[in-house]
Amino acid sequence: MKRVFLMILDSLGIGSSVDACKFNDSGADTLGHIAEKCFFNEANVQRRGSLYIPNLIKLGIVKSYQSSTGKYLLGFNQKEDANIIASYGYASELSSGKDTTSGHWEIAGAPFLKDWYYFKEKDNSFPSSLINKIITKLKLPGILGNCHASGTEIIKILGEEHIKTGKPIFYTSCDSVFQIACHEIKFGLSNLYKICENIREILDQNKYQVARVIARPFIGTNKSNFNRTGNRRDISMKPLSITFMEKLIQEKQGKVIAIGKISDIYAGVGISKNIKSTGLYELCHTTIHQMKSAKNNTVIFTNFVDFDSVWGHRRDVSGYAKGLEFFDSKLSEMIDLVKEGDLFILTADHGCDPTWKGTDHTRENVPILIYSPGEEIKFLGHRDTFSDIGQTIAKYFSLSDMKYGKSMF
């Protein structure tokens, strides 16, 4: 029986990549800086002391980090990672961006080698011609925002006006994204989704290569209690080249079970079943449940988004550390479900250093940890592209070769 469990710890970078200077990210180090803050008791909100992740250590995260940075994680010693059970290494990104879509597509063997379209202006971010087309087609009373913003902050600033006027809040960031925030009840979730779908069509028709249109629903009655809900939806471009998931379905009649926002990231392409799940607790338990029932030629593919969206972007070191420790506590259950012949792969899609300036992603190397009971444990080295993961999975399932990447086994 052949099964792959592919876990994306969204934003768990392990040190700035060689090209980080091009992104003003030299020195960024998501895992390293979290461990440092924990070690010096500067991340003690709802937790205390050094970062406690024994199961990630067992899979080789400390060795992976050390090989990426040349440094040792503060708060850990060499004895702790002496009994590693998985092969470990790290990878640099080939794609031109440091965003969710680029990272995930590349992991699946389809790197994005062109340039995304970015809305670079901090104010009046979206071209007036584009806004006019959207307003006209959707018969909107107007829009609010039209700027770079933090999603949690802009609803505090404009949420009340949005409720009064019915104007959706448009905003973006340094990533290739078009985000729309609307009140889930007053405006309506289905109306928000419909707007996002239409904007995706307009962008595609007008040759804007924008990675994602993101619905950002929120609830509350005023700026003091507005909160985003779990009903976010990402409407992505479709991958520009074939992924290992498509090959598995086409060549082996296999199944790809997408958990969390995975299906949205790939625009539903190469996905057999989409399971909606939000929050770290629910994502962990849904993943464990699906692992228990996974059949032959199946991939269980989960994105643990909270590391990025809840703690990374919000620069919450304590929250990120606490999240890692919770995930680690559930990781032991996942490891116990991996049988001989299975592949359990843990990696990330980019960095989002919670100690870094601003609120954006950081260009970093990512860990590659591969656990397969009974297989030889080895150092996987420095991989030049995340696509080595996709190629490894393709070879494991005896699929035709991917265009990008080299198998690690």
UniProtKB/Swiss-Prot annotation:
Q: What is its EC number?
A: 5.4.2.7
The note on cofactor binding and number reads: Binds 2 manganese ions.
Q: Which reaction does it catalyse?
A: 2-deoxy-alpha-D-ribose 1-phosphate = 2-deoxy-D-ribose 5-phosphate; alpha-D-ribose 1-phosphate = D-ribose 5-phosphate
Compartments annotated for it: namely:
Cytoplasm
Residue ranges of coiled coil:
none
What keywords are annotated for this sequence in UniProt? Cytoplasm, Isomerase, Manganese, Metal-binding
- Alphabetized GO MF terms: magnesium ion binding; manganese ion binding; phosphopentomutase activity
The UniProt similarity line reads: Belongs to the phosphopentomutase family.
Q: Mind telling me what this protein is named?
A: Phosphopentomutase
Q: Which organism is it from?
A: Buchnera aphidicola subsp. Schizaphis graminum (strain Sg)
The organism's taxonomy opens as:
Bacteria, Pseudomonadati, Pseudomonadota, Gammaproteobacteria, Enterobacterales
